[in-house]
Each structure stands twice: as C-alpha cells, then as structure tokens.
C-alpha cells in the first residue's frame, strides 16, 4: 500500500548550502521531518551545481518520512549567470543591463525544458527570451 502524502513543501535553496536555519528548519519542522537528514541529502545531490538556486519539492508522508524532487534553476538565475550580471534592471524597457547570445539562450532553454510548459526547444527559447526581456537583458545573434 502506498504511503499517504500529508504535505508538499516547495523551497528554493542555494545548491550545497542547505542548513537547519530559517527558512528550511521551520518549514520542515512543522511537519515533523528530520531536518538534518534532508539537509545532508540535498547538499549531496546538489554539490555539483554550487552557487545556483535549486528549487525543491518535498513530499512529506504520514510516517514523517519524505522524498524530494529537484527542479531546474530559475530562468532568471541562469540568464544572470550567462550575462555576467548581479541582478536584472529596475527599468527593463529603458535601461538594458546585459546581453546574451542566441546560443546561450538555446542552452538555457534546453536546461529549463523539463520544467517549462513547452513542447520543443523553440517554444522554450521564446519563454526564456521573454524572461530575459523583462530583466533588461538583450538577446544578440
């Protein structure tokens, strides 16, 4: 018989840097999850992606055990890394803060494809291009 899911917790944590301090501790603690076990597992599975923010979806079962699914980093984080900028523009329509190439855009779209609501890479590229535009990042050929 399958275990019954009591809660689904969604968090965005920097890869390899999960610790029991807020926001992780309180979010998991209120469901009775072993926080240190989660932190160790998360850090082990994200060690190769250090520095990126990795969203995670944690399913908590009635016996207080848990499983978690790692998602792909947010498109905005990947765009910032590709453009070499700290943050997006406050006025994206007036002030442009960086540039990325079409090749970089395609690479980001391929990374994000499993989590996006798109059937092919071209549709994913359009979604990521929209995010870049809203951040004040220009796409160049």
From Swiss-Prot:
Maturation and modification: One or more lysine residues are methylated.
UniProt-recorded name of the protein: Large ribosomal subunit protein uL11
Lineage: Bacteria, Bacillati, Cyanobacteriota, Cyanophyceae, Gomontiellales
Membrane spanning stretches: none
Gene name of this polypeptide: rplK
Role this protein plays: Forms part of the ribosomal stalk which helps the ribosome interact with GTP-bound translation factors.
InterPro entries the UniProt entry points to: Ribosomal_uL11, Ribosomal_uL11_bac-typ, Ribosomal_uL11_C, Ribosomal_uL11_C_sf, Ribosomal_uL11_CS, Ribosomal_uL11_N, Ribosomal_uL11_N_sf
Signal peptide bounds: none
Binding partners and assembly: Part of the ribosomal stalk of the 50S ribosomal subunit. Interacts with L10 and the large rRNA to form the base of the stalk. L10 forms an elongated spine to which L12 dimers bind in a sequential fashion forming a multimeric L10(L12)X complex.
GO molecular function: large ribosomal subunit rRNA binding; structural constituent of ribosome
Any one GO cellular component localisation term in the record: cytosolic large ribosomal subunit
Stated family: Belongs to the universal ribosomal protein uL11 family.
GO biological process, one term: translation
UniProt keyword terms in alphabetical order: Methylation, Ribonucleoprotein, Ribosomal protein, RNA-binding, rRNA-binding
CDD domains to which the protein is assigned, alphabetical: Ribosomal_L11
Pfam family of the protein (one): Ribosomal_L11
